A protein has these predicted regions:
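Glycine-/small-residue-enriched transmembrane alpha-helix faces in small-molecule transporters
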Residues: 2-58, 95, 168-195, 210-219
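Cytoplasmic-side transmembrane-helix entry/capping segments in multi-pass membrane proteins
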Residues: 25-28, 83-92, 140-153, 200-209
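Specific transmembrane alpha-helical segments of multi-pass solute transporters/efflux pumps
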Residues: 34, 39, 69-121, 157
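Small-residue-rich packing faces within the transmembrane alpha-helices of Major Facilitator Superfamily
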Residues: 36, 62-66, 152, 214-215
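Membrane-interface helix termini and inter-helical loops of multi-pass transporters
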Residues: 40-51, 107-110, 159-172, 221-235
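Specific alpha-helical transmembrane segments that line the substrate/conduction pathway
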Residues: 55-66, 97, 102-145, 182
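Hydrophobic transmembrane alpha-helices of multi-pass small-molecule transport proteins
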Residues: 68, 91, 131, 140-162, ...
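Loop-to-transmembrane alpha-helix entry segments
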Residues: 84-85, 118-121, 137-157, 169-175, ...
Length: 235
């Protein structure tokens, strides 16, 4: 019989013995890996049925809503009540990060490949660095300059690849513009989220910001789309 102490052994749960920095890096890599699949699934959804970006994003938000309601409730039970300043910060960042950024991203994927979209969208860390340097008094390190150069060189190569396949410069430019707007709004969100997370905690902030963006997305859907858009038209 296996005792409970056996499962606490490093061989069963090695992350229990990791440092905070190592665990943070592992979680960030896992998040980036999962985040990378989003564009692939969105492209598959566009190919499977005639659906617009607003409807698809609305469905995505609704499916995720129960999880964020639970996380927000659990994280807020023992926490102090939110002030007006907290709510203002949550509304602004929720609209910027998960509503505007996601909407621009879904619109861009109607025009460009998932590969180019990923490359452009993942420039948001470098954009966050630039925002910090230009507006928050932070310094730019040499390794960050190298990361910026590599990021934009990769975008140039992927852009040329998409253009050679699509043959439609206008479509590629429109799609790239939407996705770059998504990266920029998400970078602004990331820069503003740092003090919000310190004040509210990461789980509470993320859940409440997502609830704000979900509300905004549903309002956008009901204003611009008929309810029949939620009914699949394919076989």
């Amino acid at each position: 019989m296996i005792s409970q102490n056996t499962y606490a052994h490093p061989a069963f749960m090695p992350w229990k013995h990791w440092s905070a920095e190592r665990l943070g890096i592992a979680l960030a890599v896992l998040a980036a890996f999962g985040f990378s699949f989003k564009a692939i699934f969105v492209k598959l959804a566009y190919a499977a049925a005639p659906v617009d970006a607003v409807t698809l994003l609305s469905l995505r938000m609704v499916f995720a809503l129960p999880a964020f309601l639970w996380i927000g409730f659990a994280a807020s039970r023992a926490a102090p009540p939110l002030t007006r300043r907290d709510w203002g910060m949550l509304v602004a960042l929720g609209l910027l990060g998960y509503y505007a950024s996601s909407m621009l991203d879904f619109l861009g994927l109607q025009y460009i490949s998932a590969g180019l979209e990923r490359l452009i969208l993942f420039t948001y860390p470098t954009l966050t660095v630039l925002i910090g340097v230009l507006f928050m008094g932070k310094s730019l390190e040499k390794r960050q300059v190298g990361a910026l150069a590599l990021s934009y060189a990769g975008i140039g190569l992927a852009f040329a690849h998409d253009l050679s396949i699509a043959g439609d410069l206008r479509a590629v430019l429109i799609g790239a513009g939407f996705v770059f707007g998504s990266a920029l709004t998400y970078a602004l969100y990331s820069a503003g989220a740092e003090p919000a997370i310190r004040r509210l905690g990461s789980a509470r902030f993320a859940a409440l910001a997502m609830l704000v963006s979900t509300t905004a997305t549903q309002i956008h859907f009901f204003i611009t789309q008929p309810l029949s858009a939620l009914i699949p038209s394919g076989p």
